Structure formats: C-alpha cells, structure tokens
Amino acid sequence: MDAAEGSIVIKAPVAAVYKRWLAFEDYPKFITAIKHVRKLDENHFSASLAFNGKQHKATLEMMLRVPERRLAWRTLADHRAPDHLAAGVVSFASLSDQSTCVTLKLTSSFGGAVSRRIGTYLQNFKALIEDEAPKEDQL
C-alpha cells in the first residue's frame, strides 16, 4: 500500500473550500488520476481512473461527513479488482475568515505512486478554488 499526506493553505473561507470538495464530479479537474466520477446515490460514486498506463474502475463510498471539517471515503471491493483498494481523508481547518488549511491523506494499492502525486493534487485544488474566487475589481 502506498500512503501519503499533504497540506496546503487556500485563500478562501472554509465553507467555500468544503463545498467545492463536495463537488465529486469535478475531481478530475484536480486529481489527475481520476478521469470521470458519477454519483450513484448520496454516499456512493463510480470512478474511472488511469495511472501507470492502465485503466481502472472503482466504486467509492463516502464514510464520514463532518460539515466544514472532514470527509472520509474508501473504495469498495469489486470482483473486477478485488485487490485494488484505496481510502482517503480530507480535513479542513479555518485559519481566518479568508484562509483554510486543507490536509489530504490517501492510501492506495493501485500502484499509482500517491506519495509523488499528493502535492500536485493539492496544488491543482488550490488553483481551482483561488481561480474561481471573485477578484477585488469584480466585487
């Protein structure tokens, strides 16, 4: 199992950052290994992933939601890929009215070198959030 943890400070209020992370269908915009996400129900999602030259499909289960604080999820065992398991936790800490620390922890058996990619995922998420924020001259 490959495991990694990383943190980043985002210039946005915790409520906005948390809400954006809940937009599961947008994960491919910042987690480059995820190619497509489809919501199945309130707590389950189908995901298509690609890394190491291979395509993978997984069903993700949201296990924990603490509004504006924490989310946790895992992949469910599947007959197509019984040995491919992953889990993640993302925590949100308000540093000020306009600043949030995001900490992401990922564990994966997919062999995608999560430890090398976690920083990129967080940087991509930060860019997504901060690029969407209204600029002062737009207010």
Language-model region placement:
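Short strand-coil-strand connectors
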Residues: 50-54, 82
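Hydrophobic ligand-binding cavity/cleft-lining segments
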Residues: 1-44, 124, 128
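Tryptophan-centric aromatic hotspots in well-structured domains and transmembrane helices
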Residues: 21, 47, 73-75
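Generic structural detector for well-ordered beta-strands
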Residues: 7-11, 38, 48-50, 61-63, ...
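Short, solvent-exposed loop/turn elements at beta->coil junctions and helix N-caps
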Residues: 35-36, 48, 76-78
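Beta-strand/loop substructures that line and gate deep hydrophobic ligand-binding cavities in soluble
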Residues: 59-64, 72-132, 136-139
